[in-house]
Curated annotation (Swiss-Prot):
GO molecular function, one term: tRNA binding
Protein's UniProt name: RQC P-site tRNA stabilizing factor
PROSITE patterns, per the entry: S4
Keyword rRNA-binding among record annotations: yes
Organism: Helicobacter pylori (strain J99 / ATCC 700824)
Family: Belongs to the RqcP family.
Keyword annotations: Protein biosynthesis, RNA-binding, rRNA-binding, tRNA-binding
Stored InterPro entries: RqcP, S4_RNA-bd, S4_RNA-bd_sf
Function field: Key component of the ribosome quality control system (RQC), a ribosome-associated complex that mediates the extraction of incompletely synthesized nascent chains from stalled ribosomes and their subsequent degradation. RqcH recruits Ala-charged tRNA, and with RqcP directs the elongation of stalled nascent chains on 50S ribosomal subunits, leading to non-templated C-terminal alanine extensions (Ala tail). The Ala tail promotes nascent chain degradation. RqcP is associated with the translocation-like movement of the peptidyl-tRNA from the A-site into the P-site.
């Protein structure tokens, strides 16, 4: 699944266009490198979202098969990465 579609599906961003724009300006990183919107994600990858307020990191637990994941089920697909 494309990273822009994944971000929208699990609810990290509201719209896919916003996810695409974030990737294009370098606000989305995948496994430590800047990700283009078409980059494919897989289980175990680490996504870093660079916001003005700071950086949020998530580990991908599984790839959703639904178009949009219900908010109550988000924890099945992503987990916040703990600070070491």
């Amino acid at each position: 699944m494309r990273i822009d579609k994944f971000l929208q599906s699990v609810g990290l961003v509201k719209r896919r266009v916003l996810a695409t724009d974030m990737c294009n300006v370098g606000a989305v990183w995948l496994n430590g490198s800047c990700a283009k919107p078409s980059k494919e994600v897989k289980t175990g990858d680490v996504i870093s979202l660079h916001y003005l307020k700071g950086i949020e990191e998530y580990t991908i637990l599984q790839i959703p098969t639904l178009k949009n994941v219900p908010r109550k089920d988000t924890h099945l697909y992503i987990a916040p990465k703990t600070k070491e």
